[in-house]
Amino acid sequence: MKPSLAADEMFSEGPGYMEMDESGGATGMMMDHLPSNDKHVHADFYNDFDDLFDEDNWAKMKTDGKQ
């Protein structure tokens, strides 16, 4: 029995790809989708959250026996 391709039903007809030359490469593709006012979004981001991988806190929890 030959397996059928179920993925064909999920996509519309026509090419499901984009030529890399159309957008100027991979970086160009990403930058084309960002409006000019959103390109500096990370410049105003404040890193006020605790360290998610705080090794000292993990070692302290293991020695205290508390979780």
From Swiss-Prot:
Known partners and oligomeric status: Probable component of the COP9 signalosome (CSN) complex.
Entry's family note: Belongs to the CSN9 family.
Keyword Transmembrane helix set for record: no
Function: Component of the COP9 signalosome complex (CSN), a complex involved in various cellular and developmental processes. The CSN complex is an essential regulator of the ubiquitin (Ubl) conjugation pathway by mediating the deneddylation of the cullin subunits of SCF-type E3 ligase complexes, leading to decrease the Ubl ligase activity.
Protein name: COP9 signalosome complex subunit 9 homolog
Keywords, sorted A to Z: Signalosome
Transmembrane stretches, start-end: none
A Pfam family of this chain: MYEOV2
A GO cellular-component term linked to this record: cytoplasm
Residue ranges, annotated region (Disordered): 1-31
